[in-house]
Curated annotation (Swiss-Prot):
Domain of life of the organism encoding this protein: Eukaryota
Name of this protein: Eukaryotic translation initiation factor 4E-binding protein Mextli
Gene: mxt
Compositionally biased spans, kind Low complexity: 314-323, 525-536
Keywords, sorted A to Z: Cytoplasm, RNA-binding, Translation regulation
BP GO terms, sorted: female germ-line stem cell population maintenance; positive regulation of translation; regulation of formation of translation initiation ternary complex
Top-level taxonomy: Eukaryota, Metazoa, Ecdysozoa, Arthropoda, Hexapoda
Inactivation phenotype: Mutants are viable and fertile but 14-21% of embryos fail to hatch, displaying variable segmentation defects affecting anterior-posterior patterning. Mutant ovaries are generally smaller with fewer late-stage oocytes than controls and females lay fewer eggs. Reduced cap-dependent translation.
Xref: PANTHER family: EUKARYOTIC TRANSLATION INITIATION FACTOR 4E-BINDING PROTEIN MEXTLI
Domain KH: 227-292
Annotated GO MF terms: eukaryotic initiation factor 4E binding; RNA binding; translation initiation factor activity
Outcome of swapping residue 605 to D: Abolishes interaction with eIF4E1
Effect the entry attributes to changing residue 581 to A: Abolishes interaction with eIF4E1
Compartment(s): Cytoplasm; Cytoplasm, Cytoplasmic ribonucleoprotein granule
Organism of derivation: Drosophila melanogaster
């Protein structure tokens, strides 16, 4: 008999689901949003500083940071930076129990590994099971009544007859810990949810402006590097005080202390800011921190100490308000001079203003005299301006407190009033630099423009073309037409072409008001005097921007244009603008022994350009040029006979 098998309906059997325990559901509900997590971090940080925290809140924080750590790192990195400074310090606090400190260490290592918690969880779980055997009552830890709170290592209980730790007791203690942690997680989450923003942790207490962040106990030398590093915390509101306008103030601190200061990027609304200081030595970093603290408290730039001979040495150009402090070498004081810088209330570290002013006047007078002896006529105007500036500066220094050892308190260039009471200009002459400093704007301006006009004149350019040097090594002196012996200098005469309306300047310098500051660059109102007022400045600009002549035609055209510009202004100056010699004078110079003296770079000329050497043997006088014979040959040359064309044909026939 055949049996037919009827098909049975197949049921979809679901896989067994894991049992839902109370701890797992509690932990699932304990995941916090980012705002609540930030509030929980602030609450835990405040509790750790006041030794009034609970292990449950730290457990909840650890559980959430394992999940939301990377997201919080990207959103609010400054919050984690401030909190982990406290976590590092609290992990070394012996008043906290072992369990709390282990969780803090796990948090620190978790962030150090970029929130990769694979190996970290297994390691700290084994350590936690050992430390939890001792006192299960530590979950209700109170800093005031905790027995053995100052113990740094756990003391294991000993059973009566065995003398070891029971594995069953350890498992039971671990289960009790998990249950207690799960029960307290929801309570900690509720506390964090209702927390207010006033409980936000602040590393800097009132009255303190800078503090060590805790990352380095002191300026630490980086292994394998040649520099030290330290990290401090300042208020974010004080960042502008340290930074200054366009970073000038922090650059001055870096220059004085020879360090590099880096500010941490923070989000808007951050209360504090981390600052890293890198320097070659520990004392330089400490000095930078002292300068930062002094700058924040005074809300002013640090005081720059300059040697007295360099007073007024830093100067700016005519069209720039920035100082050239970048060329000043940084000076870091030693221990004793550092104390002299910072102890402003010590009377023994100061000298009287009168003595300092006299000392400065003597040194400036000596420097001016030496400058006059070297350059003579070229720096006559500079000497007068420098003497007036030195006298004015010495007078202005009276009544101010100055430091000894030939040092003077200089004004900071990182503030808005960096040029108040002091005017500085620079005149460039080739590779050389002339600096003019004074307290009278008109006098300094006149000195600069007079020097610009002189160094762009035809006389000075002719001396440059003749090979005159400014380094003192050249023995050749170029001939020049001297200035008139009587009367004032030529550039002070009202009718001369110096490029400056001195009649306006002299009249306005008596009252020294602000209306005449732009007289030099103002458009002239009178058509007749416009040419004479603009000739000097126009010639100065042409000399700086014109191309050097390479052909006689171009040079002749330029000289003709200069003579046309100078016509009608001053015949004496126009005649002195160009120096020419006749052939007899040049032949007389050729017979001088100086014309046969070897130049200083003779060896270099032989190596680089041997083709230009005409006489190879200088000892052979027969091959030398004889001026007398050449002049006689010109005068006694035979006259050529001029013959007509028809006579030439007759001769040919």
């Amino acid at each position: 008999m055949a049996h037919t098998h009827l098909g049975r309906a197949v049921k979809n059997i679901e896989a067994p689901r894991p049992l839902k325990t109370q701890s797992r559901s509690s932990l699932k509900n304990s995941y916090l949003v980012i705002e609540e997590l930030i509030q929980l971090i602030d609450n835990v940080t405040v509790g750790l500083q006041s030794c009034n925290t609970t292990p449950e809140s730290i457990t909840l924080l650890l559980h959430n940071l394992r999940v939301h750590g990377p997201q919080l790192e990207a959103v609010s990195k400054d919050t984690l930076d401030r909190a982990f400074v406290v976590f590092r310090n609290a992990s070394q606090d012996e008043r906290l129990n072992i369990t709390t400190r282990l969780k803090l260490l796990e948090l620190i290592e978790l962030r150090a590994k970029s929130w990769d918690n694979d190996d970290t969880i297994a390691y700290y779980k084994s350590k936690q099971q050992i430390s939890n055997v001792e006192l299960p009552s530590e979950y209700q830890y109170d800093a005031g009544v905790q027995p053995g709170a100052f113990s740094t290592s756990p003391t294991f209980g000993v059973s009566g007859g065995v003398g070891g730790v029971n594995d069953g007791a350890a498992a039971a203690a671990a289960a009790v810990f998990n249950a207690a942690s799960a029960a307290a997680a929801a309570q900690a989450a509720a506390i964090a949810a209702v927390g207010t923003s006033n409980q936000q942790h602040m590393l800097l207490p009132p009255g303190e402006v800078i503090r060590n962040s805790g990352k380095f106990p002191k300026p630490t030398k980086i292994p394998g590097k040649t520099y030290c590093k330290d990290e401090v915390v300042i208020r974010n509101a004080d960042s502008g005080k340290v930074m200054g306008i366009k970073g000038r103030r922090v650059h001055m601190i870096e220059e004085l202390s020879e360090t590099i200061i880096s500010f941490q990027r923070v989000n808007p609304g951050a209360k504090e800011r981390l600052v890293q200081i890198t320097g070659p030595a520990e004392d330089k970093i400490n000095y930078a921190k002292q300068l930062m603290e002094d700058t924040i408290r005074r809300n002013a730039s640090p005081v720059r100490l300059e040697p007295a001979p360099a007073v007024g040495g830093s100067c700016s150009s005519l069209n720039s308000s920035n100082s050239d402090d970048a060329i000043v070498q940084p000076r870091t004081p030693t221990g004793s001079s550092l104390a002299n810088r910072l102890s402003f209330n010590s009377a023994q570290n100061f000298m009287t203003a009168t003595a300092a002013a006299q000392q400065i006047s003597q040194q400036m007078h000596h420097q001016t005299h030496h400058l006059q002896h070297q350059q003579q006529q070229q720096v006559a105007a500079v000497a007068a301006a420098a003497a007036a500036a030195a006298h004015a500066q010495a007078t202005a220094a009276a009544g101010k407190v100055l430091r000894p050892n030939q040092q003077l308190l200089m004004h900071s260039y990182s503030t808005n009033d960096a040029s108040v009471g002091e005017y500085k200009f620079t005149v460039n002459v080739g590779q050389h630099l002339i600096k003019i400093t004074g307290d009278c704007c008109e006098l300094v301006r006149v000195a600069k423009l007079v020097l610009d006009d002189y160094f762009s004149s035809s006389e000075f350019l002719a001396s440059i073309e003749a090979g005159a040097a400014f380094d003192g090594t050249s023995l050749v002196t170029t001939p020049s037409t001297p200035l008139p012996g009587a009367g004032p200098p030529q550039f002070w005469l009202p009718g001369t072409d110096s490029g400056i309306g001195l009649n306006c300047v002299v009249s306005s310098s008596a009252n020294n008001n602000g209306e005449g500051d732009d007289e030099v660059f103002a458009e002239p109102s009178n058509g007749g005097s416009s040419t004479s007022n603009q000739n000097g400045l126009a010639r100065s600009r042409r000399s700086h921007f014109s191309r050097k002549e390479s052909t006689p035609e171009t040079k002749g055209a330029r000289e003709k244009g200069d003579l046309d510009d100078l016509a009608g202004t001053n015949s004496l100056k126009s005649n002195a603008s160009r120096v020419s010699y006749d052939i007899e004078h040049l032949l007389y110079y050729s017979m001088s022994p100086h014309s046969w003296t070897l130049p200083t770079d003779w060896q270099k000329m032989q190596e680089t350009a041997p083709s230009i050497l005409r006489n190879k043997d200088l000892q052979d006088e027969s091959q030398r040029f004889d001026g007398d014979k050449y002049l006689a040959s010109i005068k006694t040359a035979a006259k050529r006979d001029i013959v007509a064309a028809d006579e030439v044909e007759t001769l040919d026939e």
